[in-house]
Amino acid sequence: MRAAKMKQALKNWFAALLLAVPMSAAVASGGGHYEKVDIDLRDQVSLQHGAQIFTNYCLSCHSASGMRFNRLKDIGLTEDEIKKNLMFTTDNVGDVMVAAMDPKDASKWLGAPPPDLTLIARSKGADYLYAYMRGFYKDPTRPTGWNNTVLAGASMPHPLWQQQGVQAVELDAKGQPVMIKDEHGNLTPKLYWESTGLHSRRLPNGKVIQKEYDAYVRDLVNYLVYMGEPAQLQRHRIGYMVLTFLFAVMLPLAYFLKKEFWKDVH
């Protein structure tokens, strides 16, 4: 009886260990029905490109007060590269990332203060951000002239419209937006492409392909995930070492210890 209980306890321990990684990944991905984005924090080229997009476009209005410029060395950038290409609001590489726009002006022009983006990926999830940055469309009823399929009534104008192009909402005979159901049954505006951008192109049949823009946004989101927890690069390496130790050392020891304890039990 005791041997059976011991065996069941070991099974439960292994099951919990194997479930830990996918469960944590599910929590980090955020809720909602959004297309899955491929996040790879080992891809330094993607992280560096994402950092460039962030500092060139996002940092104009949004701060990242929990992130210092010198942490970008962790993704393979030198101090000279950081100062030359990514720093526009300070000369000190040890400073935190502060928005170029005054928060009071941002509140006045946009109707709400732009949120700090340090932890936005941990708060909203990578898939949400990926969908959000591809969901902008022209909406003349909004103060900024823009709206978003993911966050209706968003006060943020499209910062990357030159890269993506311009989507606009289709209107019915009464001048009201035409609404359709998406694959999940949610009502969403029916959009059409008014123009393409630097990273999208229109085929002869009229269909617009934006694979290049999708990759562009993926790099930005990849960086936002990294920025939310820069230490996770090291944490992942340590985690693999711990798991290797558990399976290569502790598991055999536990097995032989169990055999020694129960060798006289019949």
Predicted regions and their residues:
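Electron-transfer interface patches adjacent to heme c in soluble/periplasmic c-type cytochromes
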Residues: L77-N186, L191-Y213
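Sequence/structural segment immediately N-terminal to covalent heme-attachment motifs in c-type
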Residues: R42-A64, L220, R237-F245, V249-L253
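Structural motif marking the loop-to-transmembrane transition
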Residues: A3-L10, H236-T244
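Electrostatic cytochrome c docking/interface patches
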Residues: S29-Q52, S63-D74, I82, G228-H236
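Post-cleavage N-terminal segment of exported redox proteins
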Residues: R2-L41, Y226-A231, V249-H266
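Extracytoplasmic/secreted proteins, especially bacterial periplasmic and envelope-associated proteins
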Residues: V45, H49, I53, D116, ...
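Short, aromatic-rich amphipathic segments at membrane interfaces
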Residues: R202-M241
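Sec-exported extracytoplasmic/periplasmic mature domains
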Residues: T55, L59-G66, R122, R134-K138, ...
